[in-house]
Design a protein with these regions (language model features):
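General structural signal for secondary-structure boundaries
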Residues: 1-4, 101-103
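Electropositive phosphate-/nucleotide-binding environments in soluble metabolic enzymes
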Residues: 2-6, 22-26, 40, 64, ...
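Generic N-terminal amphipathic, Lys/Arg-enriched alpha-helix
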Residues: 3-18
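Alpha-helical phosphate/pyrophosphate-handling elements in metalloenzyme active cores
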Residues: 17-44, 58
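Divalent metal-dependent catalytic cores for phosphoryl transfer on phosphate-bearing substrates
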Residues: 39-106
């Protein structure tokens, strides 16, 4: 995984300025870490997934763009494909099957 929590935080705050959306990202990060702990999965990876799941939303709120734009950025930055898939699958309009525990938790 080509990220740390600090790098993910920088990415989030680069794209997201609204306090409400940042609080949402932090809450989802915490929830995902708790789910990862329960499932004995990688808490850092799951937390970063939660932190970044809507990072592109403020700049790309239309369903044709979110989370596609964010997924493209994450792929270019070297984030794992399972995380990118979970982020895409969390958006109902993408109509992607939620297969993994990460997909379902997010």
């Amino acid at each position: 995984m080509n990220s740390t929590r600090e790098i993910a935080w920088q990415l989030l705050t680069q794209y997201t300025k609204g306090e409400g959306l940042i609080k949402h990202a932090l809450a989802v990060e915490a929830a995902m870490q708790a789910y990862a702990h329960n499932f004995k999965e990688d808490q850092q990876q799951w937390g970063i997934c939660g932190l970044l799941h809507d990072f592109d939303y403020e700049q790309n709120p239309h369903p044709k763009d979110h989370p596609r734009v964010g997924a493209k950025i994450l792929r270019e930055l070297g984030y794992p494909e399972d995380m990118i898939y979970a982020i895409k699958a969390h958006a109902d309009h993408m109509k992607l099957e939620r297969k993994s525990r990460m997909d379902k938790a997010l």
